[in-house]
């Protein structure tokens, strides 16, 4: 059986919190920001948790995370 390998793109985008939830960054905050309102950009700040429907695919991409 081959080694289980972590997806490099996933380990750069996700962090596992101590409680077992996964933290991710918000999308739509990199470029073309002039046409977005200040309120919209403010709501995109910070990190949010990955939704439980996506946790299965995250667990496959991060096999060593113990999800």
From Swiss-Prot:
Matches recorded under InterPro entries: Ribosomal_bL35 (IPR001706), Ribosomal_bL35-like (IPR021137), Ribosomal_bL35_CS (IPR018265), Ribosomal_bL35_sf (IPR037229)
Protein name as catalogued: Large ribosomal subunit protein bL35
Phylogenetic lineage: Bacteria, Pseudomonadati, Pseudomonadota, Betaproteobacteria, Burkholderiales
One GO cellular component term: cytosolic large ribosomal subunit
Organism annotation: Delftia acidovorans (strain DSM 14801 / SPH-1)
Family: Belongs to the bacterial ribosomal protein bL35 family.
Record keyword Protease present: no
Keywords from the UniProt entry: Ribonucleoprotein, Ribosomal protein
Recorded coiled-coil stretches: none
Gene Ontology biological-process annotations: translation
SUPFAM superfamilies: L35p-like (SSF143034)
GO molecular function: structural constituent of ribosome
Gene responsible for this protein: rpmI
PROSITE patterns documented for this protein: RIBOSOMAL_L35 (PS00936)
NCBIfam families: rpmI_bact
Disordered: annotated span: 1-24
């Amino acid at each position: 059986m081959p080694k289980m390998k972590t997806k490099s793109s996933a380990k750069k985008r996700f962090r596992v919190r101590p409680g077992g939830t996964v933290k991710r960054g918000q999308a739509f905050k990199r470029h073309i920001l002039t046409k977005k309102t200040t309120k919209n950009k403010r709501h995109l700040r910070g990190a949010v948790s990955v939704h439980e429907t996506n946790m299965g695919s995250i667990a496959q991409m991060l096999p060593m995370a113990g999800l």
